[in-house]
Amino acid sequence: MGSDADADLGERRPFPVSWDQFHRDCRALTWRLNEVGPFAAVIAITRGGLVPAAIVARELGLRVIDTICVASYAHDKQGDLQVLKGVSEQTAALGHGTGKGLLIVDDLVDTGKTGRMVRDLLPDAHFATVYAKPMGKPLVDTFITEVSQDTWIFFPWDTGLSFQPPLKDGAA
């Protein structure tokens, strides 16, 4: 989920994304990435990057998929970053230790804290996200949709089917 570090959810603009829309956006991202590659491997930033990385890997025909596990969110608040798991030695070797020829995928770049940390680890990798906010956008090489910094994206894996009251009734 996207977040501003100090704002509460009531001050953000909701942006619900359906599975169909997310899949279309990931395929559109892949069309752009196909012009930039080839890539030796995909690295998903977990957890948000797992679903888009799977779609991108399928569409690009990539079989080497790795993860970098970075924790920055607790519920709806952004906190300190921790690398819980780095990329494997085999994947790092494919990228010559700097990430050259590797594709890093995440669902969203928000403030850029996670992106900056991953960029420091793999400075030559190509960094792609489905969605980008203005603060983090400069860190991303390829993205599909820009949203405002005060937008809160509700990804399909974070939501369930439920009644939505009409906007006229004060629904956000």
UniProtKB/Swiss-Prot annotation:
Family: Belongs to the purine/pyrimidine phosphoribosyltransferase family. XGPT subfamily.
Protein name as annotated: Xanthine-guanine phosphoribosyltransferase
Enzyme Commission no: 2.4.2.-, 2.4.2.22
Cofactor(s) of this protein: Mg(2+)
Entry GO CC: plasma membrane
Positions that bind GMP: 110-114, 152-153
Membrane topology designation: Peripheral membrane protein
Residue numbers binding Mg(2+): 107
UniProt xrefs under HAMAP family: XGPRT
Keyword Glycosyltransferase among record annotations: yes
Compartment(s) of residence: Cell inner membrane
Positions that bind xanthine: 110, 153
Protein's organism: Rhodopseudomonas palustris (strain HaA2)
Assembly information from the UniProt record: Homotetramer.
One annotated GO molecular function: hypoxanthine phosphoribosyltransferase activity
Gene symbol of the encoding locus: gpt
